[in-house]
Amino acid sequence: MTTRPDDSKQDHLTGTSIIREPGPPPREISSRDYAARLLAAPAALVQLSLVEAKIVVSYMRPEKVDAGVTFITEGDADNTGFMVLLLDGEVLVESITVSRTTPVTITVLGPGSLIGEMGILDTGPRSASCTASSNIQCAVLTREALESLIAEQPGIGAKFLLAVSARIAERYRDTQKKLKLFARLASTMQQELNRKQ
């Protein structure tokens, strides 16, 4: 993993403020083994073996983000070149829905969560905002590092992409189920309102 310069106060990929400590370069987040175990866990990409996850992690770099910093912004189409494996801390995922001006909390993510994987694959605008609700430590995989992984370790790169795609498909199916449930709830509520009139 590459280390960050201590004098910078912003991450060049996300434009967010990053915790910088004076002195020698920051140590790796915990260890590559810890990050690999999180990456290969059921909460992330269970399809990867621990050995494969260690190879993927070797293409990531450690980052720290201050509590309160929004490091992914919904609708941002310019800042999609990375994904994050959360190692420590919590991230609040929010979205602004139609006809609302304040964001709705979608979920709170903890260690082992993958964040931003859709953007790294399709370069489309970010679908939600992600804010560190505590100081977080994470491993960042850039699009350039992903391309290097695919070129240098094509089998593992392909397996990683399939695992990420399966995870996105799983979340899509879950979202569809929730939308159907909300549609039934809205229909029931409308019927109740119509009956009272």
Predicted regions and their residues:
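Cytosolic regulatory regions built on CNB/CRP/Popeye-like sensor folds
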Residues: 1-197
